[in-house]
Amino acid sequence: MNNQSKRLWIEPIQGSRRKSNFFFASILFGGALGFFLVGFSSYLGRNLLPLLSSQQIIFVPQGIVMCFYGIAGLFFSSYLWCTIFFNVGSGYNQIDEKTGIVCLFRWGFPGRNRRIFLRFPLKNVHMIKMEVQENLFSSRHILYMKVKGLPDIPLARTGENLNLKEMEQKAAELARFLHVSIEGF
């Protein structure tokens, strides 16, 4: 969704609070907790989970490995839940033709750099760049803004899976609004 008029373009960015992240964090947490509890059950010699039997699992080779995988999975799961809780990556792109300023805002992890805020003059924007990355199973289309003195800045939403036609249309609208050219490959 773009809120745009003739002189102002505001595009909200979703960030990490997506259904897929909730799904993967939940599945990872459940699996990691199961691995850890089965490994710990083999250490204690009794079942902590009524559904999973740990009687055949010997602690020294298998139980330790299952505990290790469980702890590693719990760390990855907690990282995913932190990104969801802090909504890392969300923000907005704002282009104001009236003042001639481009503002890009994103939320990060807590700390000194929690708020990522880029602000630069509109005249420093050289072009909109569209990049297509294809691999065996999927293709990813990324939209960048080329700005003088800065590396290419990604503009497209993280979870946005637009096809090539939609991405070209979005790039054309943005380039028309900014009065710049499009580079694509």
Curated annotation (Swiss-Prot):
Keywords: Chloroplast, Membrane, Photosynthesis, Plastid, Thylakoid, Transmembrane, Transmembrane helix. One of its GO terms (biological process) is photosynthesis. Coiled coil: none annotated. Its main location: plastid. InterPro entries: PSI_Ycf4_assembly. It is a multi-pass membrane protein. The chain crosses the membrane at residues 22-42, 57-77. HAMAP family: Ycf4. GO terms for cellular component: chloroplast thylakoid membrane; photosystem I. This is Photosystem I assembly protein Ycf4. Pfam families: Ycf4. It comes from the Eukaryota. Seems to be required for the assembly of the photosystem I complex. It is found in: Plastid, Chloroplast thylakoid membrane. It comes from Welwitschia mirabilis. Belongs to the Ycf4 family.
